[in-house]
Amino acid sequence: MAFTASDICKIIVAVILPPLGVFFERGCGADLFINILLTILGYLPGIVHALYIILKY
């Protein structure tokens, strides 16, 4: 799997604001709402989920 420039930008955004990184990758859907919930419950779970979504798709 090769990383593109957009993947790198999404990863940087995901570390700063995890829901925004998920939104850029998947749009407004269940993944975004799960990530918002995880970010509210704890910042680190939100980052992990965002990175998982970005690297998976």
UniProtKB/Swiss-Prot annotation:
The chain crosses the membrane at residues 34-54. InterPro entries: PMP3 (IPR000612). It holds the Pfam family Pmp3. It is a single-pass membrane protein. GO terms for cellular component: plasma membrane. The keyword Transmembrane applies. It is found in: Cell membrane. Keywords: Cell membrane, Membrane, Transmembrane, Transmembrane helix. Plays a role in the regulation of membrane potential. Could mediate a proton leak. Belongs to the UPF0057 (PMP3) family. PANTHER family: HYDROPHOBIC PROTEIN RCI2 LOW TEMPERATURE AND SALT RESPONSIVE PROTEIN LTI6 -RELATED (PTHR21659), PLASMA MEMBRANE PROTEOLIPID 3 (PTHR21659:SF116). This is Plasma membrane proteolipid 3. It comes from Neurospora crassa (strain ATCC 24698 / 74-OR23-1A / CBS 708.71 / DSM 1257 / FGSC 987). The gene is pmp-1.
